């Protein structure tokens, strides 16, 4: 096949590339990333994490990255340099944060420089969740109207989500079971993926996306090749071109092999 193997390959982090049973990237996934790079592919993360929530990723992983779409599309980085920020409408930010202050909801907001913080309310449960996932805990500083790229408010109460929805006039709301995410209207994982790929000179057909969660669905659907992890949610699997094995059963490596994005070890040597 004379078609170039080079692609822009985008990975969700948690439960797709980074295993929380291992607290690391599986060895086979590291092998896949190294081989993708040898084939001229660009490797990027595509995540809801704010920039500060990336600091404790394994150095071996960050050394392999060409770019990151953070804050669910709110910040796009090429080799550590921010090339685009999608600012949430200030009125929307004010209304949602004010609602959360009045209704005792915990908020984590993230600014244009990648900083993250809780606002007025804070619970040990959510702080522990951040520590479990990201090995860091956000500080707590009241929002003072600085530009934001991402707001997460925590509630399991659908009525509270329904009360917040009409407060957002120009923003995108991703409702998850507990962590509900606000971004600018034009910011999501899919748009961030396509913008970074274009910046690198790849078109949509040359993008590959790996994901597992509800917030990965659009990215998986829009990518030239969309792959859901075996441990992923049903919506991700339905959107995918291919469902691979679980993260802890070499899912990333097996999918790369299946589509010829990389070659098996022993055939590579002649």
PLM feature spans:
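Non-catalytic pre-domain segments flanking phosphatase-related domains
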Residues: 1-11, 34, 38, 269-270
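Short, well-ordered alpha-helix to beta-strand connector turns
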Residues: 6, 40, 65, 148-149, ...
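Asp-based phosphoryl-transfer active-site loop
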Residues: 7-22
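Active-site phosphate-binding/coordination module
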Residues: 24-123
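Hydrophobic/aromatic beta-strand patches that form the interior of the parallel beta-sheet core
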Residues: 44, 69, 208-210, 227, ...
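Conserved acidic, metal-coordinating active-site core of Asp-based
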Residues: 99, 103-222, 231, 238
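Asp-based, Mg2+/Mn2+-dependent phosphohydrolase catalytic module
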Residues: 222, 227, 232-270
């Amino acid at each position: 096949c004379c078609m170039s193997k080079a692609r822009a390959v985008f990975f969700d982090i948690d439960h797709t590339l980074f295993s929380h049973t291992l607290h690391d990237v599986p060895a086979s996934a590291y092998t896949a990333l190294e081989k993708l790079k040898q084939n001229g592919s660009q490797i990027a993360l595509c995540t809801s994490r704010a920039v500060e929530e990336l600091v404790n990723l394994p150095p071996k992983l960050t050394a392999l990255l060409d770019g990151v779409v953070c804050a669910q599309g709110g910040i796009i980085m090429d080799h550590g340099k921010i090339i685009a920020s999608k600012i949430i409408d200030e009125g929307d930010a004010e209304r949602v944060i004010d609602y959360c202050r009045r209704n005792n909801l915990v908020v984590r907001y993230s600014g244009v420089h990648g900083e993250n913080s809780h606002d007025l309310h804070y619970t040990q449960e959510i702080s522990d969740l951040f520590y479990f996932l990201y090995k860091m805990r956000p500080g707590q500083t009241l929002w003072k109207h600085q530009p934001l790229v991402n707001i997460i408010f925590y509630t399991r109460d659908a009525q509270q989500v329904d009360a917040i929805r009409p407060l957002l006039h120009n923003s995108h709301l991703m409702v998850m079971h507990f962590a509900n995410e606000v971004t600018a209207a034009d910011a999501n994982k899919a748009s961030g993926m396509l913008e970074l790929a274009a910046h690198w000179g790849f078109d949509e057909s040359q993008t590959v996306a790996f994901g597992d969660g509800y917030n990965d669905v659009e990215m998986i659907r829009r990518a030239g090749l969309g792959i859901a992890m075996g441990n992923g949610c049903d919506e991700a699997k339905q959107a995918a071109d291919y469902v691979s094995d679980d993260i802890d059963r070499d899912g990333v490596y097996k999918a790369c092999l299946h589509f010829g994005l990389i070659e098996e070890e022993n055939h590579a040597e002649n």
